[in-house]
Amino acid sequence: PATLNRFGLKDADGKSLTLKADGTGSFADYIRSLYIASAEGALKSGADISRFKCLTVKDGHVTAIDMKAYAKEVNRLKPVPAFDWFDAGSGENDEFGTVKNTPRHFTAFSSARDPKHHAMAPAKEIALLDPFTSISRKDVTVAPHFRIRHGFEDRDTVLAVPASVAL
């Protein structure tokens, strides 16, 4: 929560979006509303969403989502940690690799658990692939238009990431 809260995110109405230590808060409510909107869009387009027990549909509209049930129904595409693997064996570890194709870590969490002790990528290189490094700076002009595609069943990353970038 501390990292997300530091970004000073606001919704379209200017309301601050934050999280409490327990994961609840206005940002969690915002993410919930995005999932509901995505499911509502699918329903309106004729998709059968009845298999999702996490959704509540009343009078032809998606009215609620049980986020704990959603996490169980639409399971992860990759195991934890999804990107920076402990053994530095992921494609993302290669992306941060050396010119000699030696993979490197980009999180202290995975680096500390690596049985082979692969090196960490330099902070400057890690920052290049973190959109928040740039878009949160005052001297950066963010593109006025960009496309983020993420829907109800996307599992490559959590919706909070593209939603935060969009804000």
Write out the residue ranges for each language-model feature.
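Accessory cap/linker subdomain of secreted extracellular hydrolases
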Residues: P1-K138
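Short, well-ordered beta-strand segments
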Residues: V165-L167
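Acidic catalytic loop of the alpha/beta-hydrolase fold
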Residues: E153-T157
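Mobile, glycine-rich extracellular loop/lid and propeptide segments
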Residues: A160-P162
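Short beta-strand/loop motif that positions the catalytic acidic residue
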Residues: R147-H150
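Proline/glycine-enriched tight loop/beta-turn segments at coil->beta junctions
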Residues: V140-A143
